[in-house]
Design a protein with these regions (language model features):
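N-terminal glycine-rich phosphate-binding loop and ensuing alpha1 helix
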Residues: 1-61
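Residues at the starts of beta-strands that form the adenosine-phosphate
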Residues: 2, 47-50, 73, 98, ...
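Active-site glycine-centered loops adjacent to acidic/histidine catalytic or metal-binding residues
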Residues: 9, 105, 221
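Phosphate- and divalent-cation-binding pockets in alpha/beta enzyme and binding domains
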Residues: 13, 36, 59-62, 86-90, ...
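A structural signal for short hydrophobic beta-strand segments in well-ordered beta-sheet cores
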Residues: 25, 144-146, 208
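Short beta->alpha linker loops
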Residues: 29, 55, 80-83, 214, ...
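Conserved beta-loop-beta/alpha segment of the NTase-like Rossmann-fold superfamily
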Residues: 60-61, 68-147
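Catalytic-core segments of class I nucleotidyltransferases/pyrophosphorylases
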Residues: 121, 151-236
Length: 236
């Protein structure tokens, strides 16, 4: 399986807390969080790992180059984009088959992710398999609406959950090159990853199906970082 890591953000909340390194380099267990994620992806059978890395982060670019020189299948794509969807589009450009995309701060159980990789590989070509979770810790989660037939039919950013259930995006996206091509082919221009997910579910013929994780969250501040180390310690 190919993986795409989005590492374009500086991490404004970490900056406010006094961190001097860019967000992907914030440590988990004394290692950059993006390195911890890459180790997990290797454990889950990575064929190729594409990293959309902010071109203004030399510390990150140097670190990724070190990993590549050590033989890891990392392809660095230096980017400067307007929003998170544009980062996804640039980082995944040229991938024809299936891939799983995520941000550099994604935290999830490794065993469940292995099952997710298998499910994405086996999903029909016209189906996007999106990670969801009932573990809601984010201040402004992206709520998902799942129909009675089990299909994701809408998303809502912040506010109240849909009436059907409280379930949110896990920040894990099972996609393909052909699915990525549907959005621009319809003349749609998502303003963010959240907008991309909603447009994919509401405005395109792509079938969007859920894959549920017991726990999944992003690392946006020191509190999240400590939680991530606690959870990863248990899962490992």
């Amino acid at each position: 399986m190919d993986f795409v890591i989005l590492a374009g953000g500086l991490g404004s909340r970490f900056v406010k807390e006094g961190y001097e390194c860019p967000k992907p380099m914030v440590p988990l267990f004394w290692r950059p969080m993006i390195g911890v994620l890459i180790d997990t992806l290797m454990e889950c059978g990575a064929d190729r790992i594409y990293v959309g890395a902010n071109a203004r982060m030399p510390m990150l670019l140097d670190y990724l180059e070190e990993l590549r020189e050590k033989g890891l299948p990392v392809e660095v794509r230096p980017i400067i984009t307007d929003n998170s969807y544009c980062t996804l589009k640039a980082a995944s450009e040229g991938i024809e088959g299936k891939f799983i995309a995520m941000t550099c701060d994604a935290i999830f159980p490794t065993d469940e992710f292995k099952d997710y990789v298998k499910a994405v590989a086996e999903a029909p070509a016209d189906t996007a398999l999106m990670g969801l979770t009932r573990f809601v810790e984010d201040e402004s989660p992206l709520y998902a609406r799942v129909s009675e037939s089990g299909e994701v039919v809408d998303y809502r950013y912040g506010g109240e959950p849909f009436a059907e259930s409280t379930i949110v995006s896990a920040g894990l996206y099972g996609l393909s090159g052909s699915i990525m091509g549907v959005i621009p082919a319809l003349g749609l221009e998502p303003e963010s990853l959240s907008d991309f997910q909603r447009l994919l579910a509401v405005k395109t013929p792509v079938k969007v199906m859920p894959f549920e994780f017991t726990i999944a969250f992003d690392v946006d501040n020191t509190r999240d970082r400590l939680h991530a180390e606690e959870f990863l310690g248990k899962w490992k």
